[in-house]
């Protein structure tokens, strides 16, 4: 069995009585009935040659798939470095976005239409690999045991 890392201090995971898995995240909320989960996956891939994406997907019998992911830059010197481009373009917008929505730009899913638009996909970005690993552990435990869980990132 894979060794489990300690969950970050800004996360909490506890059983609930609802037979649902619930995620309360800084950028939104997600809930699914446990009987509707058909598969759970955790995987990593390289995006545009310079970002490592680590992703947890939860597939359901409904019409949508949910993706939770964490981004890590591979190199700071690449001319395609999306992280630097986003930081440069968004420096003046961060404060206005947070004031208007209550969400930091760093917590928001970043898309390039139409390349990263996924029909019927709900997406959440997490800010650390530890948060993503804790989320995977929570949803997998709920699905495996049939007991609802509530996962929170503060």
Label the predicted regions.
Residues 1-154:
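Eukaryotic intrinsically disordered, low-complexity regulatory linkers and tails enriched in Ser/Thr/Pro
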């Amino acid at each position: 069995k894979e060794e489990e890392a300690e969950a970050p201090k800004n996360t909490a995971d506890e059983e609930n009585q609802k037979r649902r898995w619930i995620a309360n995240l800084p950028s939104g909320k997600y809930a699914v009935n446990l009987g509707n989960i058909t598969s759970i996956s955790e995987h990593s891939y390289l995006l545009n040659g310079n970002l490592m994406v680590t992703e947890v997907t939860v597939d359901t019998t409904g019409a949508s798939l949910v993706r939770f992911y964490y981004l890590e830059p591979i190199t700071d010197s690449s001319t395609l470095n999306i992280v630097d481009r986003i930081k440069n373009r968004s420096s003046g917008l961060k404060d206005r976005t947070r004031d208007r929505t209550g969400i930091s730009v760093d917590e928001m899913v970043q898309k390039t239409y139409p390349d990263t638009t996924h029909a019927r996909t709900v997406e959440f970005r997490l800010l650390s690999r530890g948060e993503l690993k804790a989320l995977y552990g929570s949803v997998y435990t709920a699905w495996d045991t049939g007991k609802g869980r509530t996962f929170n990132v503060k």
